[in-house]
Amino acid sequence: MAMKKLLIASLLFGSATVYGADGFVVNDIHFEGLQRVAVGAALLNMPVRVGDTVSDDDIGKTIRALFATGNFEDVRVLRDGNTLIVQVKERPTIASITFSGNKAVKEDMLKQNLEASGVRVGEALDRTTISNIEKGLEDFYYSVGKYSASVKAVVTPLPRNRVDLKLVFTEGVSAKIQQINIVGNHSFTTDELISRFQLRDEVPWWNVVGDRKYQKQKLAGDLETLRSFYLDRGYARFNIDSTQVSLTPDKKGIYVTINITEGPQFKLNSVIVSGNLAGHQSEAEKLTKIEPGELFNGSKVTRMEDDIKKMLGRYGYAYPRVVTQPEINDDDKTVKLHINVDAGNRFYVRHIRFEGNDTSKDSVLRREMRQMEGAWLGNDQVEAGKERLNRLGYFETVDVETQRVPGAADLVDVTYKVKERNTGSLNFGIGYGTESGVSFQVGVQQDNWLGTGNTVGINGTKNDYQTYAEFTLMDPYFTVDGVSLGGRIFYNDFKADNADLSGYTNSSYGADGTLGFPINENNSLRVGVGYVHNDLSDMLPQVAMWRYLESVGERPGYDGREGFTTDDFTLNLGWTYNNLDRGFFPTSGVKSSVNTKITVPGSDNEFYKVTFDTSAYQPLNEDRSWVLLGRGRLGYGDGIGSKEMPFYENFYAGGSSTVRGFRSNNIGPKAAYYANGGATVTNSTDAVGGNAMAVASIELITPTPFISEKYSNSVRTSIFIDSGTVWDTNWENTAKTRAAGIPDYGKASNIRVSAGVALQWMSPLGPLVFSYAKPVKDYEGDKSEQFQFNIGKTW
């Protein structure tokens, strides 16, 4: 019986066993201990084959190769004559992975990290990898201030060489900062410096940013804030010498000590721009001008670099290198800035692509582009395309990427990635007020009809006082130059008396069409014509109404009037300025418009109306979660010549679109009715509107509580103050009106004010809008409508 010789017994092969210079020829290879791993797979990983002449070095390579597969805990190679016997112990297979006690770290994140490390169900268990994962997770907890945290991997053996892996977390509590000390500050107090930190040793109740829980990343950010604070104030030699973080014995408290050297303040001496600026030296120098005696400012240096990059980017130099080297003169305390520029290659756009537009046609997006294919890359043109796509209102998000073309020194591809939102809506609206009760509204509208960018809509309202229906159509690119064409037809049966307005009924129908002409990127003009037929009846003898009838040659008497009709043709003119950052939930920019309507010869009436609307959004923080919104609306109309503007063209205020908290259309003059054959006048609470209006609103858009970042683009909350007034410039106080106690409706000073909160949500079920407002300043006869909501269905 041949004697087996032990060749290798560990991972590191030694040369203790020597077979001679020529080794031996392998006639056969046998494996012992294989369970999960197939013999063929094991043989493929071995550098030795049957028939090979092997030496001690070859055996060592064999063992290392088998260990490298990660399938074995132990490998031994023995020789029985000319047969190699490979004895292995397989690593156990992971049958399941579970977690316990993890609150700060979600299971999905843990599974992703384990997957990235090769730890997954069905794979072999590598105890070294598990130990590294334990340490890595504990380091993570330490970095967020949980110094008492521990992570232990519990391995439970199962039959057939399998194991259950369970990670047990003991997270503990976050260590809180007991004190932050800054040593070496002479020009500024410690409190003044710490007030700019996120980490605090004391956090007032009103500070929603400050945090006493220690986090390593936040400390690093605060140190950078401290450095920027000094560099922006001329301290060019400022340095953070050291930072000590000490832990209390119970691991629940943290003391932070920051040692700094302020150094003296330095002034800017001059700025020298040099290098390859591709012929744009003078433009770069204009961007780097300084004032005499100006302090050194680190942020300004960064802005100079960014401005030069943006300037070159407009001319196709997409990847310039801009480096600033400050030359500090400690004798006269000045700094000379040397800005070296290398414009690099000019890049041209090969392709512009769109991703995510499953509904919208490519042509709808492409016509908004200002960057052209084949032209040099202009960063401002690329950004303009992004802004215009956002402004369409079809997309929740728009991102743009510029990628260099592999193998080409001067070509890039531009890719716009969009996430479409539901632009079609089937809306069912409900309004409820303390006086108005319940009203209903239905509407079908598609702002991006079949992905063409056209708007098609059918809207209707039905309540106690109105039956309204309209069909609208608008093509924003009626011509390739961006001339738009829109139109609508409508029918309206309005019973003013049921709406607590001045008593009359108006059955009207009409149509209008409008052409829009783009002037530049942000301005456009509109020209349109319209026709409307009004059939008035059930008119009660109301002072302002009778004043209008008399101005058009009617003698209504004092018992009411039936069967008065008008046909009017109008010329409609408008202007719009829009630089909002997006069409849906804007966060910055201004949108303003002026609209004018004037009757033309052939009309029964002669009047004009002018309205001005504006909305301005100002972000208050970097991520634009806090935004200040200001809105305003002005309106004025009057008759031409001796005629008055029709009373049914009056302006109204109150309701969700003007002054929330007040009933719709209820703000302003109230009806004064003739009585006793015109001998007297009586007061009422029926609103009649006026020929002049002013509305203003200030709104603070805030982060929505308890909403994850995933839904932040579809939910908006705000706190607002609305104000407005409506008046009649043709109103005349007479002895009759004064005797009836009727106020002077010609005054613009009777301003109503309300305050409240609002929530808007583009939900999967449709657009939902909630508002609750309470009148702060009102007048006798005003009616409130404090709560309103709107529910819709989108597709």
UniProtKB/Swiss-Prot annotation:
GO terms under biological process: Gram-negative-bacterium-type cell outer membrane assembly; protein insertion into membrane
Which superkingdom?
Bacteria
Which Gene3D superfamilies does the record associate with it? membrane protein fhac, membrane protein fhac: a member of the omp85/tpsb transporter family
The residue ranges of the POTRA domain are 24-91, 92-172, 175-263, 266-344, 347-421
Q: Which UniProt keywords apply?
A: Cell outer membrane, Membrane, Repeat, Signal, Transmembrane, Transmembrane beta strand
Q: Name one Pfam family in it.
A: Omp85
Region forming the signal peptide: 1-20
Q: Which GO terms describe its cellular component?
A: Bam protein complex
Q: Where in the cell is it found?
A: Cell outer membrane
PROSITE patterns the record matches: POTRA
Q: What does this protein do?
A: Part of the outer membrane protein assembly complex, which is involved in assembly and insertion of beta-barrel proteins into the outer membrane. Constitutes, with BamD, the core component of the assembly machinery.
Write out the similarity annotation: Belongs to the BamA family.
Task: Please give the subunit comment from the record.
Answer: Part of the Bam complex, which is composed of the outer membrane protein BamA, and four lipoproteins BamB, BamC, BamD and BamE.
Protein's name according to its UniProt entry: Outer membrane protein assembly factor BamA
What species does this protein belong to?
A: Yersinia pestis
Origin organism lineage: Bacteria, Pseudomonadati, Pseudomonadota, Gammaproteobacteria, Enterobacterales
